[in-house]
Structures are given as C-alpha cells and as structure tokens.
From Swiss-Prot:
InterPro entries referenced in this protein's UniProt entry, alphabetically: Membr_insert_YidC, Membr_insert_YidC_N, YidC/ALB3/OXA1/COX18, YidC/Oxa/ALB_C, YidC_ALB_C, YidC_periplasmic_sf
Organism: Bordetella petrii (strain ATCC BAA-461 / DSM 12804 / CCUG 43448)
Stored NCBIfam families: PRK01318.1-3 (NF002352), PRK01318.1-4 (NF002353), yidC_nterm (TIGR03593), yidC_oxa1_cterm (TIGR03592)
Molecular function GO terms recorded: membrane insertase activity
Any one of the GO BP annotations: protein transport
Listed CDD domains: 5TM_YidC_Alb3, EcYidC-like_peri
Annotated protein name in UniProt: Membrane protein insertase YidC
Quaternary data: Interacts with the Sec translocase complex via SecD. Specifically interacts with transmembrane segments of nascent integral membrane proteins during membrane integration.
Family per similarity comment: Belongs to the OXA1/ALB3/YidC family. Type 1 subfamily.
Amino acid sequence: MDIRRTILWMIFSFSLLLLWNNWQIHNGKPSLFGTPPASSAASPAEGQQAAANGQAATPSVPTTPAAAAASTVPGATAAPAAAKVEQVVVSTDVLRLTFDTTGAQLIRAELLKYPTSGQPNKPTVLLDRSPELTYVVQSGLVGAPNGQSFPNHQTPFRLVSTDHELKGDSLQVVFEADSGGLKVTKTYTLHRGRYDIDVQHSLANTSDAPLAPSLYLQLERDGNDPADTSSFYHTFTGVAVYSEQDKFQKITFSDIAKGKGSYIKQADNGWLAVVQHYFATAWVPPQGKQRTNELLQVQPNLYAARSIEAVGTVQPGATAQVDSRLWVGPQDQKAMAAVAPGLELVVDYGWLTIIAKPLFSLLTWLHSLLGNWGWAIVALTVIIKAVFFPLAAASYRSMARMKQVAPRLQALKEKYGDDRQKLNQAMMEMYRTEKINPLGGCLPMVVQIPVFIALYWVLLASVEMRGAPWILWVHDLSVRDPYFILPAVMMATMFLQIKLNPTPPDPIQAKVMMIMPLVFGGMMFFFPAGLVLYWCVNNTLSIAQQWTITRNLQRKAEAAANR
C-alpha cells in the first residue's frame, strides 16, 4: 500500500489531461471542460472593420436610465455640422496616446516602458483601432429631449489644447463639442511617470430650459485573446467589475455574449475594467454616486463595458462637472491600489490570493535588496524551502525508511502472491515494527502544495517579471528560455529525485515515474523562464535535503549495526 505513489499517479494523470485540453484549445477544438473564456479563433467582426475605416464601432450610444429622463428643450441649438476627423497624438515619459476627434475617444495607447515580447525597440500596444485589434476608451452624454443628442463618442469634437508632449509634471488634452443645448469640455490630464489619467467632463447648458444628462464611461474591445497568449497556460482575458458589496467579479466575453455574466448592476462605488495578461484598462467613476453598470455584446465579437450615471439637472446658463479616473497600463499593484480601492485585484491570483499576496510582497522586498528579479526568485525559493524544512525532513526520512525496507516488502509480495488481505496485514505489521508511517512521505508534500501553487501564480501573473533579465542567456523571465537550458536542468533534477526515491515494485509504476520528467520537462519548454527557474531551484534544494537526510539515516543505521 503506497499512497504517496497513488497521489503522484493522480497528479501525473491530471497534468496529462490539462496538457491535452490546452492542445485541443490551441487547435481550435472545444475545451474538455466547457467553452474557452475567449475565442482567439474568432473571425474579424464587422465592428472591427468599420473601426479600421475610421467609423464608430458601436452602432448606438447607451440609453438613458429612467431616473435621468430630460424635459422638453424649446431653445436647444441644433448639432453643429460635421467637423474634419483628426487624430491627435500626445506623449508622456511612459505613454504615447492617440485620440480621435470623433467623440474625443482614446483609440491607441503605447506603453513606452514595456517593449513588445521579442521586439525590445517596439512598445507594447494596449489600445488600438485596427483590423487586428479593436480596443478603445469612450465616453459621452445621453438623455437629450425631442430626438436630439448630447455630445457622445460619435459626435465631432474640436481640439482646444495645443501641447502634445509632456514638458512639466502634467499635460492636459482638451476637446470641446456642442450638441442638444449642451456644451461639453472633455479634459484628459496625464501625469509624469503615471498610468492613471484624470478625465473631467465639464457641462454647460446653453439652452433655455433645464437639462438632465447622464454620463457614460465605456470600454470597448473585441473578444480575441492578445497576440502573445500561450496555449500551455491559461491567463484571463475579459471584463472585471468591482464594488464594495460584491467585491471582485470576472466575466468572460463568451458569458457576455450569452447574457450569463454575473456582476453588480447598480452601485455607488467601485470600477469596471477590461483585463488581459499583465495589462488592464479601467474606468473609475465618481465614488458615492449611484450608477448603472452594463456589459453587452454590441456586434459579433465586439463587447462594451460601461457605467452610466445621472449628472443631475443643469439649469440654463449653469454648469456641472464630473471627475473620473482612467487607468491605461500595466497591472502595477501598488500604483493601482492608490488610484481606487480594489483596483489592484485585476492581478488575480485566484482562490489562493490569501497566500499569494504575502509571497508577492516578500518577492518585491527581496528584489529591492538584490536588484534582480531572477535572484529574488532564487532567494524566495530558498526561504520557502527553509520554512518547510521540518516537514520536508519528515517526508524524506519516511521515504528513506521505505527505501530501506523495500527488499523486505518485495519478499512479502512474493510470499503472499495474490492474497491481498494477508499481504496488507503483513505490510502493516512490518510498518508497525519499523515505526514507519505509510503516509509520512505524503502528508508533508500535501501541506506544501497550496504554497507552491500560489507562488506559481505570483510568477505567472506579476507584470514585474515581464522584460526582467536574470543572467547570461535569460533576458526576460516572462518568456520561455530561448535555449531551453532551464527546462533541461529541470528534467535532470527530476530524474535525480526519482533515483533518490524507493523504486516502485510495480514495473508499470516504475516506468510511469521515469516518464514523468520527460512530460513535465516538455511542458516547461513553453513556460516562462521565471517559473522554470523556480522549479529548478526548488528541485535542486529538494535533492540536497533528501540526500543529506538519507545519508544521515544510513550512517545511523551503519553505526547501530557495528555496535
């Protein structure tokens, strides 16, 4: 009865199942566990093609909530004639943004400090409006009376500001538009070294009657996975909604298309975001004001996440102002937490967040000391192994004793043959005599599993690993080892671990144990180098611990035999 090997066999079988499932998804076939969260094989939608031609991608603006219905406006001015469409490029030290004067919407964002994977001189493009990607930031006003319309993301705006490059600590990009008796001034304020943008909507009632507009803040994206998405490990691409009541809620694009997404519809706090591996875009509306959240499919493979809130009644000649914040950039947990409560949760460590967050904090602290994320991973692995050393020692002692009695165990199997009842009784008697716990090598491993899984997600999800070098040939811990040296080292360490363990008496189990390094090592060929580095260090330390403990037990046994 070897429960430890049974558990290892279960882990091995499940890993093969996951590997096959990812291969199915990679080849465009249905997932074994249901519909994939986002279809990377979807054909370009009509909305994407329209956007590439300079047209508005969304066929209509949001409807007005019932509470914000407007009254008749006898003196409202007609919408101005269409202005020339213009694209405005502005830049800071960390962002290069492109605005379209149609709707004063943000249609392209380049992250200057984050190169594209494999192209160090090309910045990552997070937002874009092209045949390959539709991902834009929009806002506007609804609730105009008598079939008129307030300025929205389809309305021609005029560029008012003149500066296109950050020279001081902040840069303002200002647009204006008049429609439906409402003059709207939209101001984007960018800051040095920051990815959060202050967005101000100033409303002036130029009509002869009160107006009651509602402001919508909208993110629009196609449902395709990012171009650099791996088929060998899953990362989330979709929408996230946060509120103090329901906390963090993730919704896949496929669930939005089916109308199945579960999220808070009415709230007076929180934010909404579109999330992908390492990066996010989020609207943070004014806190303390009631709003409606909407997630919808506006066209095939084109989705919108928006928040709509009533501005209140604006009297003739009066003005109103709504201040919001926009995040466009990496999933920097510290910076995001300073922008809005819970915004750092877009870095989703899953059900092991309670363990993962302290691990990330410790990893960040080690990086501040060592100045290198690769060495920080090595140091963190050493610390974790040291903390779990008592458990590991108990496990290795149990395995060493099992190895010592392996010949006797084989003799019992030959003696009792197919009589399983007598064999089990004899094995239990031998375990009692030798003071061996059959579960002794298994339970310590089980206790450590949640910590190692949490660390796996920390290394996979943390944007700090992206573009971070280690030594020599490893120039980016977030991509696979270009020369496959680390996966080869990992396979070698796994073979050594197997050699140190008792040989399974069952020939089939023995063959499976020898195949496991090839399977897991083969998977690691496609995993980020930071993860493989962690496994290599972990395995190396495990081998050193096991060899030391086994040698000590052998010496004690030899000393006892020589007395």
